[in-house]
Amino acid sequence: MQVLVRDNNVDQALRALKKKMQREGIFREMKMRGYYEKPSEKRAREKAEAVRRTRKLARKRAQREGLISNGRGSPLK
């Protein structure tokens, strides 16, 4: 991964690098590989993530269709 440093502005380059790494999922990958994960734990985690994704998608779909509010007290328009 490469980030350009312009006008010796290292702070800006560091922020850009962190943003790129976050977008690519590198921080999450490093956290996952920090220790050994048993195959059974991996399956359970992946299943829980899939359930979470499915619920989130269903919630978004219901909000779009106007079945539930957007969580801010007023229904979506």
Swiss-Prot record:
Entries under Pfam families matching the protein: Ribosomal_S21 (PF01165)
This protein's UniProt keywords: Ribonucleoprotein, Ribosomal protein
Comp. bias (Basic and acidic residues): 38-52
MF annotations from Gene Ontology: structural constituent of ribosome
One CC-aspect GO term: ribosome
Biological processes annotated in GO: translation
Residue numbers spanned by region Disordered: 38-77
Membrane-traversing stretches: none
Basic residues bias (residue ranges): 53-62
Superkingdom as given in the UniProt entry: Bacteria
Segments forming a coiled coil: none
Family (UniProt): Belongs to the bacterial ribosomal protein bS21 family.
Protein's recorded name: Small ribosomal subunit protein bS21
Native species: Bartonella henselae (strain ATCC 49882 / DSM 28221 / CCUG 30454 / Houston 1) (Rochalimaea henselae)
Gene name for this UniProt entry: rpsU
